[in-house]
């Protein structure tokens, strides 16, 4: 980690560090044993270990990894096919990966012609208004937009989600600050990207937004895990 002092260094993480962070993480997210995930991120970091592997193991859920190709580029090309095969319920993401997903979605929409592209843009803008900052989704007069957003979800956004296997409910984002615009985009298409915050020294999760109890807001790093004390 380059963590708190900017000089890269090794961090000693004990077995109990890991099991404690698993217990803490499960205070903010529920993982049914039927859940599946596909690990796309590098396997040599504690974020992928805790949120990708260990909380799934603790809950009896299923984990898959990307099929290794003959070259790094071939491995990357396996990701879309592996997502469709595994049909994950959630995925781990970092900003660079989220941007790439969005770029591919927009390229696919653009290929369907100008009418579909304009309709998709209008649907996005409508969903942005309805969702506001996530936490205040559909509040006040915005409730009137619910039928329109529901229709757009049925005819447009659901088809986008099918490219992710059709079962994807949310992303868990970490590694760096996730742009609020990216959060708005994925929230609009029905796959919220829940930003978290952590440090390698903390094994690593400290706080996160969550689908549980509607604990999420764009631009926020969410609620502290429990039990955990934080000093600034």
Question: Residue spans of the language-model regions?
Answer:
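Short, surface-exposed connector motifs at secondary-structure boundaries
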Residues: 5-7, 34-36, 162-169
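Conserved S/T- and glycine-rich ATP-binding loop of Class I adenylate-forming
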Residues: 1-4, 37, 42, 91, ...
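Alpha-helix/helix-capping structural signal
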Residues: 16, 96, 176-177
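Short aromatic/basic micro-patch
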Residues: 12, 92, 224
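Conserved AMP-binding/adenylation subdomain of ANL enzymes
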Residues: 19-36, 43-146, 150-157
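Conserved AMP-binding/adenylate-forming
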Residues: 128, 145-232
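Adenylate-forming
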Residues: 10, 21-25, 100-105, 182-184, ...
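Conserved AMP-binding A3 loop
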Residues: 2-22
